[in-house]
Curated annotation (Swiss-Prot):
Polar residues: bias regions: 584-603, 743-765
GO biological process, one term: regulation of DNA-templated transcription
Species this protein is from: Arabidopsis thaliana (Mouse-ear cress)
One Pfam family in the UniProt entry: zf-CW
PANTHER family: B3 DOMAIN-CONTAINING PROTEIN OS07G0563300, B3 DOMAIN-CONTAINING TRANSCRIPTION REPRESSOR VAL2
Keyword tRNA processing: no
Entry function: Transcriptional repressor of gene expression involved in embryonic pathways, such as LEC1, ABI3, and FUS3. Repressor of the sugar-inducible genes involved in the seed maturation program in seedlings. Plays an essential role in regulating the transition from seed maturation to seedling growth. Functionally redundant with VAL1/HSI2.
Protein name listed in UniProt: B3 domain-containing transcription repressor VAL2
GO cellular component: nucleus
Comp. bias (Low complexity): 674-686
Residues annotated to bind DNA: 286-387
Annotated residues for binding of Zn(2+): 524, 527, 545, 557
Domain of life: Eukaryota
ZnF start-end (CW-type): 515-565
Length: 780
């Protein structure tokens, strides 16, 4: 059975067993007050007293900005600072004026401890501890080092209190810790009375980050070590260190790569440079490195899912809603905040960001930061350019005064401790190792995002310069001059074989004149003058004018140059033109060979061939395993080099299939053309014959007194080409049917005629018989 929770706000008193409960101010028991969603949101936005305690007493105004502050209320105890001369000031004004003092800090055990008012107390506390172990722990464990400083004055009160909560530390200790501590734990008895206020811990270089999610066992709970030692101009204020952002909506924990890396100097610069942000508290939320698609013209910025759900308004429809975001100059932009369903999840984007990114002059690799101003609650969009020089300037070593972490920043006021004696060579080596690792990570963050390298195709245009480099390298190779080659003949071709490898020669320029004569020009290594040599001369890597034995007049560097500066430029240009023409001719030959083999490319990729004796020969292809001989898949059909290995006269199965298909296509094309030509010729001939027949019909002259026979058809016995074509186009079944009907009618007509003739003949015989009988009958 679930227990009923009651809101700790006396004016609310909402009770429920379910729902989202938020954490409020710390109590003496060590727990945090449980607030309902409404009260918790007001507490997180620092307007709790303005909403619920507006009519109560205890309200005072800030001496600097006249902001109303509720004194004596536990919900506003971290929102104000007491002045020594009387009065109160808000935490923002106190931070700007540098009047943040070391007040009483509320520990989780509910006890109040006195604060330290000077650096001498800090020095005395540090004297009672093992400083060697302290430095050892801080330098080896970068996760809990000074670089993990939190800017707690810019965080929400609920998150400030949550950092000190006992149950929160238990939850964090139960989770794995990514950091490995090689030093002892820091929870020693002298530190119990060294507790300081949360706000003064902001610039402490030993500030830990207990809210960071870890992956390995976490050491024992550690309290703040020292306070009041603000490293002005030190390494801590210059390095962009990832800091855990404030708690967002729900319990979503952001990955460390999205943590804001804004520094104290940048916050102060923003407050002083832009007046519209001077009266507001800037809370860094998260940041994102722009990808190529984010900085492109698509106008869409992909947001981390956890960040969008934690700090942006909740949306339930994919269309989203318009979101107003200000840039650091105060200009307001309206973006469409929406999401896309993606594998039972969501991908949140901001659409319409191209004008804003272009106004900031951002590109791929730059970082976009998102912050919130309090108490207005407006979203602010900033940026940080990615420059390689920034990361290098961060880590110049500890020789510079402003980067010496352990010489200026940690020197106590009493001067009893000599920090230089405590740092030995091994500690300095560890410091250098840590700085190198930080430099490497910073370089990884600021690297420019570009297109990934692709595999170069050897016959494509992408490697044109590479191929030229190969040809030039071939020109530099010379046969060794100390040995003589042995010549052997292979297939009517003479080859020179050397026992020693080739050597590199000097690069020369070859020029072809208009007459067809080729010249070789070489530059002296001593004087830089150009000398002309025969084409067949091979030069060593080092050559000077004194080596020019073929031309005694040019065998000295004091001899005048054979080419003027203008002629030298012409020579270089002609040499490049000569190489370009040679490369173009080789490419033309390659294209011609590819066109010639395009028809048989598939046949050349045949897998198997069957010989006359039935033996199977497998061609050299990129056939993958477990495919039997004769497989015709796309992988097995492709030869290793992408070109065919079969001859045009090959009779393998694939080659024959390709040739047969080609012959079939050509035959169909030829038959189609012949049929079209025949039909055109027949049509033209029929038209000509019809005209001739019409013109050649004889005129029938009727004699006087003769009548016209209307049943006669003068053209019935004449046969024309049109009637033949119509008869040929007449369907066969209809023709046979009509022929059968006509035959049947003719047979019936002939049978009727025979029966009629038979009847008439029998009647005539009977009449003749009667007549005969009557003639022979005697008269009675």
């Amino acid at each position: 059975m679930e227990s009923i929770k009651v809101c700790m706000n006396a004016l609310c008193g909402a009770a429920s067993t379910s729902g989202e409960w938020k954490k409020g101010w710390p109590m003496r028991s060590g727990d945090l007050a449980s607030l309902c969603d409404k009260c918790g949101c007001a507490y997180e936005q620092s307007i709790f007293c303005e909403v619920f305690h507006a009519k109560e007493s205890g309200w005072r105004e800030c001496n600097s900005c006249d902001k109303r502050l509720h004194c004596g209320c536990i919900a506003s105890r971290f929102m104000m600072e007491l002045l020594e001369n009387g009065g109160v000031t808000c935490i923002s004004c106190a931070k700007k004026s540098g009047l943040i003092s070391m007040n009483v800090s509320h520990e989780s055990n509910g006890k109040d401890f006195p604060s330290f008012a000077s650096a001498e107390h800090v020095g005395s506390v540090l004297e009672r501890t093992n400083l060697k172990h302290l430095l050892h722990f801080q330098r080896i464990d970068p996760t809990h080092s000074s670089l993990q400083m939190k800017q707690e004055e810019s965080l929400l009160p609920s998150s400030l209190d949550a950092l000190r909560h006992k149950t929160e530390r238990k939850e964090l200790s139960a989770q794995p810790n990514l950091s490995i501590s090689l030093g002892p734990t820091l929870m020693t008895s002298p530190f119990h009375d060294a507790a300081v206020d949360d706000r003064s811990k902001t610039n402490s270089i030993f500030q830990l980050a207990p809210r960071s999610r870890q992956l390995l066992p976490k050491p024992a709970n550690s309290a703040p070590i020292a306070a009041g030692m603000e490293p002005s101009g030190s390494l801590v204020s210059q390095i962009h260190v990832a800091r855990p952002p404030p708690e967002g909506r729900g319990k979503t924990q952001l990955l460390p790569r999205y943590w804001p890396r804004i520094t104290d100097q940048e916050l102060l610069q923003l407050s002083g440079q832009y007046p519209h942000l001077s009266n507001s508290k800037i809370i860094p939320l998260f940041e994102k490195v722009l990808s190529a698609s984010d900085a492109g013209r698509i106008g869409r910025l992909v947001l981390p899912k956890a960040c969008a759900e934690a700090y942006f308004p909740p949306i339930s429809l994919p269309e989203g809603l318009p979101l107003k975001i200000q840039d650091i100059k105060g200009k307001e932009w309206v973006f469409q905040f929406r999401f896309w369903p993606n594998n039972n999840s969501r991908m949140y984007v901001l659409e319409g960001v191209t004008p804003c990114i272009q106004s900031m002059q951002l590109q791929a690799g730059d970082t976009v930061t998102f912050s919130r101003t309090e108490p207005e609650g407006k979203l602010v969009m900033g940026y940080r350019k990615a420059t390689n020089s920034t990361a290098t300037q961060m880590f110049k070593g500890s020789s510079e005064p402003n980067l010496n972490m352990f010489s200026n920043s940690l020197n106590p006021g009493c001067g009893d401790i000599n920090w230089s004696k405590l740092e030995k060579s091994e500690d300095m080596a560890k410091d250098n190792l840590f700085l190198q690792s930080s430099l490497t990570s910073a370089r990884k963050r600021v690297r420019n995002i570009g297109t990934k390298s692709k595999r170069l195709l050897i016959d494509s245009v992408d490697v044109l310069e590479l191929k030229i480099t190969w040809e030039e390298a071939q020109e530099l190779l010379r046969p060794p001059q100390s040995t003589k080659p042995s010549i052997f003949t292979l297939e009517n071709q003479d080859f020179e074989e050397y026992d020693e490898p080739p050597v590199f020669g000097k690069r020369t320029l070859f020029v072809s004149r208009q007459t067809g004569e080729q010249e070789q020009w070489v530059q002296c290594d001593a004087c830089g003058k150009w000398r002309q040599l025969p084409v067949d001369i091979l030069l060593p890597p080092k050559w000077s004018c004194s080596d020019n034995l073929l031309d005694p007049g040019r065998s000295s560097c004091s001899a005048p140059d054979e080419l003027s500066p203008r002629e030298q430029d012409t020579l270089v240009r002609q040499s490049k033109e000569f190489k370009r023409r040679r490369l173009a001719s080789s490419n033309e030959k390659l294209n011609q060979s590819q066109d010639a083999s395009a028809l048989n490319s598939l046949g050349n990729a045949g897998i198997t061939t069957t010989g006359e004796q039935g033996e199977i020969t497998v061609a050299a292809t990129t056939k993958h395993p477990r495919h039997r001989a004769g497989c015709s898949c796309i992988v097995c059909s492709q030869p290793p080099s992408g070109k065919g290995k079969h001859k045009p006269s090959c009779t393998c199965t694939v080659c024959e299939a390709v040739k047969r298909r080609f012959r079939t296509l050509m035959l169909r094309k030829r038959n189609k053309g012949e049929a079209g030509q025949a039909s055109q010729q027949a049509q033209s001939q029929s038209e000509c014959r019809d005209e001739t027949e019409v013109e050649s019909i004889p005129a029938v002259e009727l004699a006087a007194g003769e009548n016209i026979d209307l049943n006669s058809d003068p053209g019935a016995s004449r046969v024309s080409m049109m009637r033949l074509l119509q008869a040929a186009a007449f369907p066969l079944e209809a023709y046979l049917k009509q022929k059968a009907i006509s035959n049947t009618a003719g047979e019936q007509q002939s049978s009727d005629m025979v029966s009629t003739e038979h009847g008439s003949s029998s009647a005539a015989q009977e009449t003749e018989k009667d007549t005969t009988n009557g003639a022979h009958d005697p008269v009675n």
